[in-house]
């Protein structure tokens, strides 16, 4: 076999069209230019070989490409970090918002799976609340196109990313080549994820009201949260963006092991540019015993939320947590199809520490 044949045999596969389209959009953002709807349509048509009217691409493809473009732009933009002062961060995110067209049209997949990309500003805030340290392992159970994960990479953490949508998994593998990427039903992440994966941090924005097994169900987000919590290593921290109707007291009562709620913030209109005016909750939970009451607030003031996040208690035994969070030493990279197995029967759980939740 010739050298050229050998080289050809080991060529990297071509990136999916959504990734190449996203890269062009990211380069526009990096050049300081705004992206209009017509710009997105033109770029998508160029890279998908035709227009959406001809069936070459769909609204969901365009949304994924635009979201991935922001992720790629943020990866390359060193001036914004998790430690960036609030005034600089606010200015940056306002500028970015002005250069991105809103998602006023929702795709069938978004509606079906309740998939809304986390806005960059809220993603930055949630990741800042994690108190990340280099080399620890972070799990994101419903990673989407990577808007939360990008901040974890900037902090130097290792990533275990799970996403059930094949399109969004393509985005993740394009943007996070060093990450372990799987395709499980995140409602069963504790049962389906490799047992050797023990994250010290979980960062998540789960679907709120649609599950694979049950269809539309207002407690879907709670089951995603519980499964991720059960996989979190002792002493770890979980930061979640949940729906306003999430029953915090019920979760705390049934949580396995020690649990301390650090923050319960109702965030108003955070997803407006993503097609919904829903109020969400930013929750911070530590897997430790504590008698302290959480900070509880309802606001749409970004600076106020940052102040609360910066005042969070330090994570327990950070060095020990970094040492115990693990990935399999030589785990192969693979995409795992979503499971259709029945949900496991509820298990007997240890009653959590009693915590008073402030009324919101």
Question: Where are these predicted regions, by residue range?
Answer:
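Short hydrophobic short-linear motifs embedded
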Residues: 6-8, 327, 333, 357
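Conserved Class I SAM-dependent methyltransferase catalytic core
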Residues: 126, 162, 166, 215-285
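Long, low-complexity, intrinsically disordered segments
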Residues: 349-360
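Short, conserved SAM-binding/catalytic segment
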Residues: 170-180
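Flexible, glycine-/basic-rich loop-and-beta segments that form/coincide
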Residues: 272-335
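Conserved beta-strand segments of alpha/beta enzyme cores
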Residues: 158, 179-182, 259-262
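Conserved proline-anchored active-site loop of SAM-dependent methyltransferases
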Residues: 123-133, 137-154, 161-165, 184-217, ...
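Class I S-adenosyl-L-methionine
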Residues: 4-172
């Amino acid at each position: 076999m010739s050298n050229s044949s050998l080289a050809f045999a080991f060529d990297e596969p071509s990136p999916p069209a959504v990734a190449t389209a996203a890269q062009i959009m990211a380069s526009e953002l990096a050049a300081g230019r705004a992206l209009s709807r017509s710009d997105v349509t033109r770029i998508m048509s160029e890279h998908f070989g035709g227009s959406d009217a001809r069936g070459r691409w769909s609204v969901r493809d365009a949304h994924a490409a635009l979201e991935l473009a922001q992720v790629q732009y943020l990866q390359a933009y060193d001036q914004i970090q998790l430690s960036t002062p609030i005034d600089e961060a606010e200015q940056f995110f306002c500028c970015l918002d002005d250069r991105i067209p809103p998602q006023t049209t929702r795709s069938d997949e978004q509606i079906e799976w309740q998939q809304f990309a986390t806005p960059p500003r809220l993603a930055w805030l949630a990741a800042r609340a994690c108190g990340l340290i280099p080399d620890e392992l972070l799990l994101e159970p419903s990673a989407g196109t990577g808007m939360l994960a990008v901040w974890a990479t900037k902090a130097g953490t290792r990533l275990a990313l799970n996403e059930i949508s094949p399109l969004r998994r393509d985005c993740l593998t394009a943007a996070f080549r060093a990450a372990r990427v799987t395709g499980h039903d995140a409602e069963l992440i504790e049962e389906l994820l490799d047992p050797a994966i023990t994250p010290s941090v979980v960062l998540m924005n789960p679907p709120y009201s649609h599950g694979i097994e049950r269809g539309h169900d207002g407690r879907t987000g709670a089951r995603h949260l519980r499964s991720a919590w059960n996989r979190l290593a002792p002493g770890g921290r979980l930061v979640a963006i949940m729906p306003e109707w999430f029953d915090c007291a019920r979760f705390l009562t049934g949580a396995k092991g020690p649990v301390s709620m650090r923050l319960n913030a109702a965030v108003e209109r955070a997803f407006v540019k993503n097609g919904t005016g829903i109020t969400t909750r930013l929750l911070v939970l530590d897997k430790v015993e504590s008698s302290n009451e959480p900070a509880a607030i309802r606001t749409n003031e970004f600076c106020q939320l940052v102040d609360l996040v910066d005042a969070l208690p330090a994570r327990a035994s950070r060095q020990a947590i970094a040492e115990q969070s693990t990935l399999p030493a030589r785990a192969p990279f693979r995409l795992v199809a979503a499971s259709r197995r029945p949900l496991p029967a509820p298990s007997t759980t240890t009653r959590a520490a009693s915590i008073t939740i402030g009324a919101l």
